[in-house]
Amino acid sequence: MNELPIEPVELKRPYPRTVKLGDGTAVRLRLMEPGDVHRVLAFARSLPADDLQFLRVDITRMLVVMLWAQNIKAGHTVTGLAEQDREVVGYASVHHDQVSWQRHLGELRVQVAPAFRSKGLGTVLGREIFAIAPEMGIEKIVAHMTPDQEQAIALVKRSGFQQEAVLHDFVIDRSGRKNDLVVMTCDVAALAGSAS
C-alpha cells in the first residue's frame, strides 16, 4: 500500500533546549529538519564500523539520509538530534506509518557517538521519543536488534521494553551474513509520563 502524503504533526514539546547528562555534559536537543542531511551524514560516517553493521539501512549513504529527510518532511518520521558545538552526537528517531493497520506503532532507532555513551544520552533521546509519541498517535514503540547487540537490548529492557519474538535468519548484515532479529516493544502510555 502506498503511503499518502501526511502533514507532519505540530509537536508541543519545546525545541531546541539544552539538557545535562549524568556526568554534567550539556547537549542541545532539537528536531531534525530536511536541511540537516549533511550534518547527519557526517555523524553517521564518524561511527565505528561495528555500529553500522546492523542498522536497518546504510545511513552513511547520501541517498539514504536524503530519503530520511523526505520522510521527516512528509510526517512519517520524527528525529530528535543531540548536538554539542553544532555537531550531531546522537539521535533518536521514530518512524510511523499513519495509514496502515500498524498506524498505532512507531519504530524506534537510536544511535549515540562513542564519546557520549555511558552518559545517559541514549536514555535521554529515547525519553524524548516517548514524550512526543502520543502527539503522533503512537501507542506502542517497537525496537529491532540482533541478539549480539547486548548493550542495546539491556538499555531498552531498562527502559521498559519486553521481548516479543526472535525471528531466525531474518536480517542480512553489511557483510552478507544472516542474523536473527530480536523484536521488542513497549507501551507508550506506560512510559510517556516519565519522559515529560
Feature roles, as predicted:
Residues 142-145, 157, 162-179:
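Conserved catalytic-core motifs of GNAT/GCN5-like acyltransferases
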Residues 116, 120-128:
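Conserved acetyl-CoA pyrophosphate-binding loop and the N-cap/start of the following alpha-helix
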Residues 169-196:
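C-terminal "cap" of GNAT-fold acetyltransferases
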Residues 117, 143-153:
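Conserved beta-strand-loop-alpha-helix junction that forms the acyl-donor binding cleft
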Residues 126, 133-145:
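Conserved GNAT acetyl-CoA-binding A-motif
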Residues 25-27, 85-91, 179:
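Glycine-rich phosphate/pyrophosphate-binding loop shared by adenosine-nucleotide-utilizing enzymes
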Residues 27-39:
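A short beta-loop-alpha structural element at the N-terminal edge
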Residues 57-104, 109-113, 126, 187-189:
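Acetyl-CoA-dependent GNAT
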